[in-house]
């Protein structure tokens, strides 16, 4: 079951016995959703426990070279409280290189070396909820 802040619970999916997870693919960015799960044994419907989730859309990111390094810019993701920038080289793994507040919509990577290729992604965060990663951006400084 799912509801919004002002709505009533509506059954969004019935799953088979033994199913322990479900992905809701109909959520909209910036909305807070409340979920509950009820068990049914054929005769009796159980009580429920409620959980609340704020869905955050992945940021839309652009990258470009600048005199100081590599400049990343992104559009605001509704509900985000901060953004985390991740970087990797062609043979490396993604590592967080910068965390900024929700008011900051750009950052320049001044540690990017000339002649090196880098890949960047950005995630929006609200408390403990992370967005999916932005589409990967590749740039050679």
Regions found by a protein language model. Name each.
Residues 1-28, 48, 84-113:
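Recognizes extended acidic, P/S/T-rich segments that occur
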Residues 1-4, 39-41, 76, 87-90, ...:
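Residue-level signal for short segments within beta-strands and strand-turn junctions
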Residues 12-17, 39, 63, 72, ...:
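Intrinsic disorder/low-complexity segments, especially N-terminal tails and targeting/processing regions
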Residues 19-21, 32, 67-71, 104-106, ...:
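A generic structural signal for beta-strand entry/edge sites
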Residues 29, 41-79, 114, 126-141:
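Pro/Thr/Ser/Gly-rich low-complexity, intrinsically disordered linker/stalk tracts
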